């Protein structure tokens, strides 16, 4: 079952705590995460949090989703994680393996006009990912067009996928970069992930030499 919750927050720093309870056994699981809601700066581009995932699922029917909201405005909002009939399932641990595909989602909130008072077209925005390890850049994606644009709200959504097979095991910081070509507007946001090292290859074992059985059920015969 997919649980979705919505709440409108004022700018500030928050700590979110999620609690899940299994009714039959009474077992409870919790997860905590810090959340920062920045102050909106008119005339400047900003990015959302960067969501990491290894799983895409078809959008569920409304009857299969429990939705909890606080306030009228949240009831009017749709899930930004749903694009083209698919939902990206965020990774809570941000721990991945090399045989997985990494799906990255984020949104750019762009101003209505550039520094020359000319309208900014959301479809012209471009975004890419840069991977850092131990402070050094080790990989980067091409700059890509948005997956979806809401021109009325000036929001461009990006969903980028890439296989993790080419990255070595370890900890990485992932930087999302968005630019508006031909303008001075750009923004970036960072998150972190851990990539598990592949399991060591099993060492070959040498079969023991054949010897007469002398264990229980077999006794040496007297000469």
Identify the role of each PLM range:
Residues 1-223:
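Intrinsically disordered, low-complexity terminal regions enriched in Ser/Thr/Pro/Gly
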């Amino acid at each position: 079952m997919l649980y979705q919750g919505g709440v409108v927050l004022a700018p500030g720093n928050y700590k979110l705590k999620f609690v899940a309870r299994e009714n039959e056994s009474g077992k409870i699981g919790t997860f905590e995460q810090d959340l920062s809601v920045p102050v909106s700066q008119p005339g400047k581009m900003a990015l959302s949090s960067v969501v990491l995932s290894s799983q895409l699922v078809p959008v569920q029917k409304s009857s299969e989703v429990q939705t909890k909201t606080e306030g009228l405005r949240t009831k009017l909002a749709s899930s930004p994680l749903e694009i083209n009939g698919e939902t990206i399932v965020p990774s809570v641990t941000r721990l991945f393996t090399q045989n997985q595909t990494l799906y990255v989602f984020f949104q750019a909130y762009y101003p209505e006009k550039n520094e020359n008072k000319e309208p900014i077209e959301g479809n012209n925005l471009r975004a890419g990912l840069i991977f850092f390890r131990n402070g050094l850049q080790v990989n980067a994606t091409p700059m890509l067009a948005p997956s979806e644009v809401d021109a009325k709200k000036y929001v461009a959504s990006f969903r980028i996928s890439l296989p993790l097979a080419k990255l070595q095991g370890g900890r990485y910081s992932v930087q999302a970069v968005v630019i508006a070509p031909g303008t001075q507007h750009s923004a970036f946001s960072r998150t972190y992930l851990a990539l598990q090292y592949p399991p060591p290859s099993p060492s070959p074992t040498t079969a023991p030499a054949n010897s007469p059985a002398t264990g229980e059920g077999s006794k040496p015969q007297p000469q």
